[in-house]
């Protein structure tokens, strides 16, 4: 049994290492076996199929990267401060996970079901937590107004992180802009952007 557990983890760790560069289609059982220094036959013994395996890979990686994203996050802080902390932590985690997230977006666009489902689960988990926080902070908002506020935070705080990293990696921006763009991804810059958006959307609550 211990062999199976250890071998399963070797395959999963191999996938975690190779997936951002190779993606779902190129990450074959043979490639995984070579990286894990195990046999292809053992892979088929341990996992029902490739989709089952990748679902486990995504789940383990996301637990490590986004395990903090839970309803009890910063539960001792006031509601507005909880929201501020959540978006700052989300920005930091997303910045660190850009290679993974962008690869999963590519695979999702190619209709890789396991990538689509894992991404949807993560986004939905964050959305539900944020929605409850917004309802607690501003109960007077209609559902439509709350959705608008959430969409503004998503598009103003999180999506630029993906865009900035992607543009830098594929080198489509002028050299003069590359460093200023990267400076927008520092901890201080991300914290400032979160503060700006929180104040812009919930300024009446800032004194509470």
Q: Where are the model-predicted features located?
A:
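Hydrophobic alpha-helical connector segments
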Residues: 56, 70-96, 140-153
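Helix-turn-helix
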Residues: 10, 14, 18-52, 56
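Phosphate/oxyanion-binding loops and surfaces in catalytic or ligand/nucleic-acid-binding neighborhoods
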Residues: 64, 93-97, 111, 156-164, ...
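Amphipathic alpha-helical packing segments from all-alpha helical-bundle domains
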Residues: 63-70, 113-138, 147-151, 187-195
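C-terminal peripheral helix-coil segments that are non-catalytic and often amphipathic
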Residues: 128-136, 140, 156-208
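Short alpha-helical scaffolding segments that buttress acidic/His motifs in well-ordered protein cores
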Residues: 87-90, 104-107, 153, 157, ...
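Amphipathic alpha-helical linker/stalk segments
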Residues: 2, 57-85, 127-134
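Short secondary-structure transition hinges
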Residues: 67, 92-131, 175-183
